Amino acid sequence: LARALDYFSSEKFHECLVLLQPLNRRYKLNPRYRAYLAVCLYYEWEYAEAIRLFDEVIPQLQGVAPHELSLYYWMDAESYFALQQYDRALPLYEKMLPLCRDNEKPDAYYRLGFCHLFAAESSGASEKASGSSESSGSSAEERKKAKECFELSLEGYLKYRNTPNEKARIAQIRHMIGGLK
């Protein structure tokens, strides 16, 4: 276990995973170590397995530091997002927001914007398929929420992360907001 934790703290997630998985099968590790295992799975792109573990252990980790918990929410949400389960990712990004640092919020709002945008597309398509005569009420609401999230994201990027590396992201967000008017 000590070697696995050394690998984890050195961000050698594959090596940590190789050691933690058999330990967890044999001894049923405590929730924090299983969260570390979920982090390793996330970095190995094993999103379904990471989700299973994060969803199991996050409710048991309410006593950890807020920032640590926010990272677990982020990775859980990102795993759902990667699997295109945006409706499942959305509440996890929302739970992360009050716990994370201010300079991390733009990324969460950016993803939330996409979750709402995909929900708008989904509800618009289902309303069209059902022949609903309503003018996409929930679709319009989701688009409004998406725009609000993208605006909050842009505000955060401009305030905390306005660097040459983020110029393309900032430009993209501006275009997204323009497209949602």
List PLM regions with ranges.
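Structural signature of alpha-solenoid helical repeat junctions
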Residues: 29, 68, 104, 142-145, ...
